[in-house]
């Protein structure tokens, strides 16, 4: 109703941006006539225009003025370098991103190409643009692929990958446009704020950021804070004992059942009953689980959580005798990440693997607060409209839906629901068998490694050849190979949580990728250094995904052939094979036998498969071969493409509704890309987690009401409504959790900003003497206020103890006596001590600088940073403890958040006072050795 009255707000926004698009189109012909040199010179002209800006506001105005011409230049560069022309809808997406909004674009609409427009425009300012993706592989792919456009136009392109050293990071962050992942970016920020010298700081001040898969980073990952931690000693036997006790405690199955503990699956928490406490205390032979000298409660709670809420092959996997976390949203393993607060150790104890040391938080920030540090933020995703309210409230980001370039021909079939999970899997296998015989490609999405293997076994029994894509290492290695052929005729692919996978499924198969793979097979063994294989192990990052044409690390001696020889649609002709061997031989002559790193070799293949101008003769030869191989393969894939389209395109099967409708939509979005036909269907059961946890009693009632056979699907409007209701409930529940995390973290965030700003001032400050003197004067004032009450008569003032305390802090004031201060007022005392402490500091400085000139300046910086870091670490722990206990205030009719803000603020002020006092004390106590020493 409102839409018809006021018009669609989304359409209004698009209408406002349309004139820009028209202008870009009008400039196209003129820009086409420019030579490569003239096109590149446009960058210089734009930069000269931007140099005239006197402030940030003027800079934004000039960017808006040059936008149409800059976009027209990027569009032309895209055609010349990549052979890709930005559609009008992609230009619209670029404008939305430049305006600091979220562009919602469907899968297959070329989001990666869209980002080149605002990245180039904002990169012209020289202040740095960060393009953020969800993993190392996508960052590398985009930097090498899209980066060619920027490099061609004269902008520098940087790439941040796991395993890079600080020098490389600094150099790459210094570029005009830097491609990176959200976690690398966040951890570099935290590390920069732990640096002990400016030379160690790798990032510049933040300017503009474009987040790919923005919903996955700002919403799915918002609940998980980034944490840098140091190790602390904790007794491992306590974890083992707690695991043994948790195994003996019984879960409460119903209200009347006594049980030892309740499990709240919704809040992912456990609550022990009185009987449980008693039983645990008896088994441990202790009086009280909360005894301060020998606390057990924390260990027991974690052990029960590990037993009830964390399932092997769903939440984690065991790899090389270690517990590795599986990301619940992407189905990928997260090597190196650990659950905090002793939970990881509890799971290690449960599974009987080696228990690693517990950690203490040194620095932490949530993605929510991290990305709010950017003055201008934007993002792209296929699905954001469902979370629009949250994106607007928390991040102040508007969502604009960009129309698709071609009309979608995807057909979403109604859900079918089975009574039991077994019946559901049988039905899925039946559907796959039927469509597979017709020759349609099928993609089945599952929610965990375990479930994908259940289906895989059923298909093996039916003798249906299929590919499995989940977090197991042997499958991760082949990810891009599997996706490249997922659209071929009759292909069956089972994928775990395929959200944000970055590689499109092309009907008929991806000839382009297969041609690159063929070149890799011949070229890599000849030109890649064998010893690089180990070095690269750290670089592949998140789960070692293999990108399109950019490989991951190899174990020594592993061959470069694809793991599935049938991947190639047809054999190469003898003639093509000869040219390929010639090109490889030529590459060896030019570069030397096994002389390149794997990354360098991958980059050569990547450039060979694009149209970027190159002066490398090897790349030119490889390009000729690449085109020949691709042409051979296309004779098969093009024909298959037409056959598959005729059959109805890719069929996507969902096997469980995800907690978030958005992830379901991402899976559906794999079918019907760029106007191709396709269909989707969800198979569910009344035993699925979502229905079990959030569907509640209504569904249980329905189960009994439907007296149907196990293998009969239930189709009912009421059930579909229950499902959507359950999903909305979950989304609201998680939104509230995130909002709460955000509100509480906001308190920490203000404190973090203050402490990091102080720290940065110290790092950059050339002369910290004045700062230390102010610390000293404030400390003197505090001592006076502590011992002198102006409301009492002067004869009752405790001046002897006041003087004693002053000498305790500053031994150089040993000559000050109570008599010196007898007849002074409070303010006179303070002025007197200010003068004395300044004199004492000059003496101290003279003594220290006798050892080595300038040593006092170094000591000042060292002690201030040391105190900030040590006390901030302790403060993080006390704030954590406060946060955990504050929830109970709700029972006392107080608002826990207000209490947390109040007490947190008081604790922060105390910490700042402690930092000041400790610095003053440490500097006056500082006794450098006779030898020159570095502090």
UniProtKB/Swiss-Prot annotation:
GO terms for cellular component: cell envelope Sec protein transport complex; cytosol; plasma membrane-derived thylakoid membrane. ATP binds at residues 90, 108-112, 504. One of its GO terms (molecular function) is ATP binding. It is found in: Cell inner membrane; Cellular thylakoid membrane; Cytoplasm. It comes from the Bacteria. GO terms for biological process: intracellular protein transmembrane transport; protein import; protein targeting; protein transport by the Sec complex. It catalyses: ATP + H2O + cellular proteinSide 1 = ADP + phosphate + cellular proteinSide 2. It is a peripheral membrane protein. Its EC number is 7.4.2.8. Residues 543-568 are annotated as: Disordered. It is an enzyme of class 7 (translocase). Keywords: ATP-binding, Cell inner membrane, Cell membrane, Cytoplasm, Membrane, Nucleotide-binding, Protein transport, Thylakoid, Translocase, Translocation, Transport. PANTHER family: CHLOROPLAST PROTEIN-TRANSPORTING ATPASE, SECA INNER MEMBRANE COMPONENT OF SEC PROTEIN SECRETION SYSTEM. Part of the Sec protein translocase complex. Interacts with the SecYEG preprotein conducting channel. Has a central role in coupling the hydrolysis of ATP to the transfer of proteins into and across the cell membrane, serving as an ATP-driven molecular motor driving the stepwise translocation of polypeptide chains across the membrane. Probably participates in protein translocation into and across both the cytoplasmic and thylakoid membranes in cyanobacterial cells. Belongs to the SecA family. HAMAP family: SecA (MF_01382). Monomer and homodimer. Part of the essential Sec protein translocation apparatus which comprises SecA, SecYEG and auxiliary proteins SecDF. Other proteins may also be involved. This is Protein translocase subunit SecA. It comes from Rippkaea orientalis (strain PCC 8801 / RF-1).
